């Protein structure tokens, strides 16, 4: 088994994507994704497919004033990067947070698939 101490290209790309998310920078965020990327939940339900649907979905999210993702842990295995995050959001019920598992498949320098599993919402 090889232990890497340097960040991989996949890990750097996913961090760039997370930074763009926290900066609410749609262009920088989309630039991390292949134009045909599919975003799914862990049960296989398609959340968005391609840049147009992703832009539409994230544009709404980026209007939330308290939106912020905090990375708790990151694991990398080859082309897969898995993040455990806490997401602070403005839910319809009020301000709160939830844990999120985010799994990103990176090929040729872009995210080609993203899987998400949300935990329970805790309101403040």
Q: Where do the protein language model's features map onto the residues?
A:
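Regular secondary-structure segments
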Residues: 14-22
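Short, well-ordered alpha-helical segments enriched in acidic and aromatic residues
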Residues: 23-37
């Amino acid at each position: 088994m090889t232990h890497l101490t340097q960040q991989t290209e996949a890990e750097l790309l996913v961090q760039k994507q997370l930074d763009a998310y926290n900066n609410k920078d749609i262009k920088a965020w989309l630039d991390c994704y292949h134009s045909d990327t599919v975003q799914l939940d862990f049960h296989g339900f398609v959340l968005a497919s391609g840049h147009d649907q992703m832009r539409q979905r994230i544009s709404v999210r980026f209007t939330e004033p308290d939106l912020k993702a905090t990375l708790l842990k990151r694991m990398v295995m080859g082309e897969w990067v898995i993040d455990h995050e806490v997401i602070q959001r403005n839910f319809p019920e009020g301000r709160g947070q939830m844990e999120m598992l985010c799994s990103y498949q990176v090929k040729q320098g872009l995210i080609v698939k993203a899987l998400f599993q949300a935990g329970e919402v805790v309101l403040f």
